[in-house]
């Protein structure tokens, strides 16, 4: 069960709003999806995620297959009951994880052979097996197995990876259909092709011919300059059908997300808000700060006066810095709550602006605030 419809189009940009319908509820787009790789968003409960405004989260086929394993998840009839999450779930196929563990993996026509990073055991992910695994996980949106390549890459290598990704996508789609996928969930194809426009066009065209539920732009945020990333995303998004959701994988900063909304992207995921939170980097309406910096030691105000998250409505910067400097576990939870709330609601606000016909003004105000010196009109902290 998966449907998508567009509801509003921005007259000034390619931004749009829409609605995805899944077996576990509707998702308004554009949407930011917190990354819950191992059936958990680090330090947060499902109730925390709901409080942050999360409509849908992301799990990872590769990691969940290795630990805890499908046999354990089978006992709960899927990830939703296993982790206590009753809203939609998207699962990545594991292609990026195989790429990131390149020294432990080998790519063939059959699939991706790899050694477990946990115990060194040998495994093989094929297009068919990743669909079978995602069926057992109970995903609302499944992803095809793809081959991601590093930056920079020679054109021949990028072409080979994109062609293999397309062949794998066809096999994924066949397995998805054979196992009753269309009645349960959506399946997205992933456009590859490195940073080469013609390869991206060829990849997108052949995936569109296969007729997927939605399309993802993969192979970004692998070391390329931001300007290149946005240019490739813009070109690739322009090749995708308007009646299907468009998913930018693994990107990015708040400013990148605002620009990608303007380019017509509908879905985003990124570890940036959660990973940075654990290191003390917090995103705010006036820019990012490092809460560990000494200038926050006596600050009685919140991380962001404009934020209504649990952290900002209850605690001071001074207290949060104290938790980080003391290595208290609460620091990671409060910082993660704030960063995810900021990311999710940045996209929620962008969506509301598109729906109200004021996205251009929203975009301008976002950049004006990010360039400001801080909520009090002075630099919030040197080196932040």
From Swiss-Prot:
Binds 1 zinc ion per subunit. One of its GO terms (cellular component) is cytosol. Pathway: tRNA modification; tRNA-queuosine biosynthesis. The keyword Zinc applies. It catalyses: 7-aminomethyl-7-carbaguanine + guanosine(34) in tRNA = 7-aminomethyl-7-carbaguanosine(34) in tRNA + guanine. GO terms for molecular function: metal ion binding; tRNA-guanosine(34) queuine transglycosylase activity. Keywords: Glycosyltransferase, Metal-binding, Queuosine biosynthesis, Transferase, tRNA processing, Zinc. The keyword Cell wall biogenesis/degradation does not apply. Residues 250-256, 274-278 are annotated as: RNA binding. SUPFAM superfamilies: tRNA-guanine transglycosylase. The active site is at residues 92, 269. Its cofactor is Zn(2+). Substrate binds at residues 92-96, 146, 192, 219. Zn(2+) binds at residues 307, 309, 312, 338. Its EC number is 2.4.2.29. Belongs to the queuine tRNA-ribosyltransferase family. Homodimer. Within each dimer, one monomer is responsible for RNA recognition and catalysis, while the other monomer binds to the replacement base PreQ1. This is Queuine tRNA-ribosyltransferase. The lineage of its organism: Bacteria, Pseudomonadati, Thermodesulfobacteriota, Desulfobacteria, Desulfobacterales. The gene is tgt.
């Amino acid at each position: 069960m998966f449907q998508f419809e567009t509801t509003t189009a921005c007259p000034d940009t390619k931004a749009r709003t829409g609605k995805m319908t899944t077996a576990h509820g509707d998702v308004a787009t554009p949407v930011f999806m917190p990354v819950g790789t191992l059936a958990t968003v680090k330090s947060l409960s499902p109730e925390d995620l709901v409080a942050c405004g999360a409509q849908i989260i992301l799990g990872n086929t590769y990691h969940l297959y290795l630990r805890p394993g499908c046999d354990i998840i089978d006992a709960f009839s899927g990830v939703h009951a296993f982790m206590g999450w009753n809203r939609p779930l998207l699962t990545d196929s594991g292609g990026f994880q195989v790429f990131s563990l390149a020294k432990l993996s080998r790519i063939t026509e059959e699939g991706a052979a790899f050694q477990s990073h946990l115990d060194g055991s040998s495994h093989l992910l094929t297009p068919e097996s990743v669909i079978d695994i995602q069926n057992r996980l109970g995903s609302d949106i499944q992803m095809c197995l793809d081959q991601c390549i590093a930056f920079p890459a020679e054109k021949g290598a990028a072409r080979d990876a994109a062609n293999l990704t397309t062949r794998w996508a066809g096999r994924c789609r066949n397995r998805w259909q054979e196992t009753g996928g269309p009645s349960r969930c959506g399946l997205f194809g992933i456009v590859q092709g490195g940073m080469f426009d013609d390869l991206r066009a060829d990849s997108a065209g052949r995936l569109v011919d296969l007729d997927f539920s939605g399309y993802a732009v993969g192979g970004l945020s692998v070391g390329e300059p931001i300007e290149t990333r946005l240019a490739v995303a813009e070109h690739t998004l322009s090749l995708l059908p308007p009646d299907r959701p468009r998913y930018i994988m693994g990107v990015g900063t708040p400013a990148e997300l605002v620009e990608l909304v303007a380019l017509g992207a509908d879905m985003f995921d990124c570890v940036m808000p959660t990973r940075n939170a654990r290191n003390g980097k917090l995103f705010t309406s006036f820019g990012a700060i490092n809460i560990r910096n000494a200038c926050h030691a006596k600050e009685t105000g919140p991380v962001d006066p404009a934020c209504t998250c649990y952290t900002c409505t209850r605690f001071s910067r001074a207290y949060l810095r104290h938790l980080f400097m003391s290595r208290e576990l609460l620091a990671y939870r409060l910082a993660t709550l704030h960063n995810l709330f900021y990311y999710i609601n940045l996209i929620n606000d962008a969506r509301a602006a598109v729906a109200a016909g004021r996205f251009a003004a929203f975009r301008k105000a976002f950049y004006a605030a990010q360039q400001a010196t801080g909520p009090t009109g002075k630099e919030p902290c040197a080196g932040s």
